[in-house]
Amino acid sequence: MAAIKYQVIKKDARTKARLGILETPHGVIETPVFMPVGTQATVKAMTPDELKEMGATIILGNTYHLYLRPGHKIIEKAGGLHKFMNWDRAILTDSGGFQVFSLSSLRKITEDGVEFRSHIDGSKHFFTPEKVIEIQNSLGSDIIMSFDECAPYPADYDYVKRSMELTIKWAKRGKKAHKNTDRQALFGIVQGGTYKDLRRECAERLVDMDFPGYAIGGLSVGEPKDLMYEIIDFTTDYLPHDKPRYLMGVGTPEDLIEGVIRGVDMFDCVLPTRIARNGTVFTSRGKLIVRDAPYAEDFSPLDEECDCYTCKNYSRAYLRHLFKAKEILAARLATYHNLYFLIKLMEKIREAIRQDRLLEFKEEFLKKYYGNREE
């Protein structure tokens, strides 16, 4: 039995967007979907009940962070990540590849794996593709990721080619090591930087390995937006129609819409929770920096069109006060709103695909979103 089952329900008439159903051991997910990030087995400032209330059906955990603290064996003893954090819906864990390359110092990459030092205490560790699968098997997440090397931007062709070759070798080894196939679906990750021939080669070779789903990695790392969209558009052409496609680390409202139009089904990003803690919120009329002075006497909600708990009960002036006073509730209320905003945006996107009016929806949404920009 496969761990997941994916079905395309409807294709948009004028774009590559798809409406789908993804069945997992912990529930059914309607796609396209945005997945809140719970790096350390918690979506920062939110309880699982609040996430359910806002409509989250799948969240992320992070292999690198959970391996270092509290340790995957402790989580396994607790009965797995779902039990440990009291979340009974789906979980996807990323492989830790990105964190090893971005957070840890003194890393040494060999064909066998990566030696790195913990960003917490400087202790030395070694990740191999097999080790990363073993950790994720202990965590018990529904969808797990291959260990990959995420090349920086910009990077020269030869470096990215070597990195892509390594990603493919590691994917093969990880797939061989993965034993829990009836309960955990392992996705391959397409790398190749901004070089189309490398993206194509990586996608085709991973598709030959027949993974139950495919991720597009190595984007949103500093490249221009137009180039990112071009690479997404190009890459999805080489991925199977009957498997889910996951764009890693991308999650601004405009990026979600553009990604869906180019055939992506799943997204995650720390941005909505991170900017919320700094006093920035998404609204239907663009980003709003609620801690700024103009809102000191603004008693309207963050977004007149939003019916989340925060917008129904509190004003911009109150949120500004909480941020200025450094109250914990500030982060909670702003985070709730931002996640709710993106989850509802995905609902609207799915409805637009249903009605074959995604391009019209994009135009209406962006016209309003960019019409009153505060960035």
From Swiss-Prot:
Q: What does the UniProt record say this protein does? A: Catalyzes the base-exchange of a guanine (G) residue with the queuine precursor 7-aminomethyl-7-deazaguanine (PreQ1) at position 34 (anticodon wobble position) in tRNAs with GU(N) anticodons (tRNA-Asp, -Asn, -His and -Tyr). Catalysis occurs through a double-displacement mechanism. The nucleophile active site attacks the C1' of nucleotide 34 to detach the guanine base from the RNA, forming a covalent enzyme-RNA intermediate. The proton acceptor active site deprotonates the incoming PreQ1, allowing a nucleophilic attack on the C1' of the ribose to form the product.
One of this protein's Pfam families, by short name? Answer: TGT
Binding residues for substrate:
94-98, 148, 191, 218
The answer to whether keyword Amino-acid biosynthesis applies is no
Q: Which organism does this sequence originate in? A: Caldanaerobacter subterraneus subsp. tengcongensis (strain DSM 15242 / JCM 11007 / NBRC 100824 / MB4)
The residues responsible for catalysis, as annotated, are: 94, 268
Gene Ontology CC = cytosol
Name of the protein:
Queuine tRNA-ribosyltransferase
Q: Which gene codes for it? A: tgt
On cofactor binding, the record's note says: Binds 1 zinc ion per subunit.
Cofactor(s) the record lists: Zn(2+)
